[in-house]
Curated annotation (Swiss-Prot):
A Pfam family that the UniProt record links to this protein: DUF1731
Source organism of this protein record: Staphylococcus aureus (strain NCTC 8325 / PS 47)
Top-level taxon of the source organism: Bacteria
Protein name per UniProt: Epimerase family protein SAOUHSC_00792
SUPFAM superfamilies: NAD(P)-binding Rossmann-fold domains
Membrane-traversing stretches: none
Family: Belongs to the NAD(P)-dependent epimerase/dehydratase family. SDR39U1 subfamily.
Amino acid sequence: MKQYLITGGTGMVGSQLVNEIKKSDSHITILTRHDQISNDKKISYVNWAKSGWEHKVPQNIDVVINLAGATLNKRWTPEYKQTLMLSRIQSTQALYELFKSRNKAPKALFNASATGYYPPDLFMSYTEVYKTLPFDFLSDIVYQWERFAQQFEQLGTRVVIGRFGIILSNEGGALQTMKLPYEYYIGGKLGSGQQWYSWIHINDLIQAILFLINNESASGPFNLTAPIPERQNLFGYTLARAMHKPHETWAPSLAMRLILGQMSTVVLDTQKVLPNKIQALGFQFKYSNLKMALEDLIKE
């Protein structure tokens, strides 16, 4: 039986990942910030906001999956920016300290990250060979998160970094936010509309995470995005058609930056990111183009 330890296991990605892992011969320990009782013999919860939580984590953990982090979908006040950073690096450091104090380290760590690692560019295509240093707040979060995760290599753990694109899911996240203006017939171009949206269907993301965990030759950063990214204007048009709504309005960049503040970088300052590394290992995307993904997620 494979033993998993998961942070962020009750979130959008984590909950679906847990449901998929349960299909195998496994036991899952989920770290949460509140007391929770499990009715499933394959799942147990540990409240790591409480002192002594480390002693409740099983000794024989095989795989750690670290998804914990405060949502980006809130206004980035100075206080919340600190929360965005600390929620990621403190949880990762706590995991590292836990296993550093033990005789047995996990075989593999999967640590979430984001395509915000790469600088915004309208023409560059980014693959995993591209290396950079932080250039803005979001890239600094990603850079520090990955750096803290890489400490696990000192323990002999295989470290896999998953740089998530825009996750398309019916259970929350970006798609629900994107759909909202179209539901009120005010959807359209954002800024120039030429910025890239590197997206991924939630089902492909879950399968990609499991593929990387189970592939012993997988290590380092992986771009977890669909093979065919889209520019925002075409993305919006495709979404509008799937919803049978118009795609006619325009929100200028200046207005969006005034309304959203620094959070506007998530929708305006984006990158064209390609999943070359995971494809080279043989992973096949079920939803490789946006039309196919949205038709699956937006049913009549």
